[in-house]
Amino acid sequence: QSRRSIHSPVSLRNKSIRIKKESTISQPTILWFRQDLRLADNPALVAACEMGLVIPVYILEDAKNQQWSPGGASRWWLHHALLSLDKSLHGKLNIYQGDPLVILTELAENNNAGAVLWNRCYEPESIERDGLIKSSLKDAGLNVQSFNGSLLWEPWQVLKKDDTPYKVFTPYYRRGCLSKSAPRRPLAQPANMQLHKLEHSLSVDDLSLLPTIGWDKKMHEHWDISEEGAKDRLDEFVFNGIQDYREGRNFPNKKNVSRLSPYLHFGQISVNTAWYAANDAAALIDNESNLDTFLSELGWREFSYYLLYHFPALP
C-alpha cells in the first residue's frame, strides 16, 4: 500500500484501517491539543507523559468541516498561542491542517503509535466529531482516552432529582454544582516530558492565521498571549482586581475586569486554576460577595457548555 501525504484529503469511507502493532514498550502516544494550549493542569498531557514518548499534535481543521469558523481576532490569538505552546514544548509541537480523523489515523499508522489522548470538547459539533474519531481509532486497535481539562463539573454530573438537566442558572449553580464535591485541584506540569518531533510538520506561519492588514498591531500592547501571560493576568486580578469585582466588572476600563476570557477559551489557563486561585485568596478579599460573584461567573461559563451538551439543537 502506498504511503499517502499527511495532508491529502483521503476518504476513509469503506476503508478498513489496520494499524500494525509491535512492542508496546516502543510505541509512542499521540497527544492531540485542541482548546487546551498549556502544560500546567493538562490531564491529557499528564497521562500521555506517564505512558512514555509523546507526539504532541495540533490540527487546524479545514473551514469546510466546521459549521462556524473563527474570526480574525481569534485566528490572531491562536497564532500567538501556538507559537507560545511550541516554545514551551521545546519546538516539538507537530502542526497539521485538514481532517483530524484522516490525520490522526495516518500519524498513528506511520509512527506505530499505541494510544491517542485528548481533553474533551463539549459543543455538539465537537462531540459528534470526537465520537467518530474515537470509535474509528479504537476499531483500529488503538488505546483512545479523553479527559476533562475544560470544566469544573462534567455536564452529566449535575442533574435535578428526576435526572433531567437544569434549564435555569441559579438552581443549576447553587443547588446542582455547589452541592457536588469540590472541583479537582489543578495538576502540576509534568516534570519529565519525552517529546518527538516529526519530519513533515507544518509551521505556525503555514496556517496563515494572521491578518493581511495590520489592524492587530495595537493589540500586542495589551496582551501577553502565552501560558505565563495567563498566569500573570490571573495573579494581577486576584491580588488587585477582585476586591471590587461585583461592581467594578461593569466598567471595562477598570482593573476589576478579569480579562481571562481568551486565556480560558484557548485553554492557556484552566478554569480549575482560576477557581482555586480566587478561593485561596479569600482571606485577602474584604467583601465575600466579590469572590462569590467571580466564582458564579465561572459558573455561567460552565452553564453555557452544560446547555450545549444537554440541548444539542440549541445552536
Residues of each region from the PLM?
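Acidic, low-complexity intrinsically disordered regions
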Residues: 1, 28, 72-73, 149, ...
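Extreme N-terminal basic, low-complexity initiation segments
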Residues: 2-9
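Glycine/tryptophan-enriched, flexible segments
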Residues: 5, 142, 164-315
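Residue-level recognition of conserved structural "scaffold" positions that shape functional pockets
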Residues: 10-11, 274
